[in-house]
Amino acid sequence: MSKNNPDNNNLFNKALSNKNEKNKFFLDTAGGNSSLVYFGKDNFIEIDCVRLDTIDIPEKIKLFKVEAEGFEPEVLYGAEKKLNNIEYISVDFGSERGMDQKNTVIEVNSFLLSNNFKLYKFSNHRTVGLYKKDSLE
């Protein structure tokens, strides 16, 4: 990161959520599916979660990428006040939520459409959507 942008590095050891609180982060030791949503594995660690709205970040954001293993709605709800300053949002909302492995397509799509984003591109291969803000404030 310092090579690409040496004067503007801010790292936060926090998970994004819709609440500022400690939460269980369930660990998947056999793959990359660790999540804040219980998916049948009892091994977890306690982590600090924060709303993106509470973090001092640059005024304008070109791309906000959300890949939260089924926790995408909560991440976006916690970013609601920042949405007016984000041009693009990429969301991986595949079948990863909880023990039933539900997708979050309908909930995420409804939320983003109601916040003046339009679905720009969609990939069935990985269930990823790219949304573009109608107009930035």
Residue ranges and their predicted role:
Residues 1-137:
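Phosphate/nucleotide-binding beta-alpha loop and adjacent structural elements of enzyme active sites
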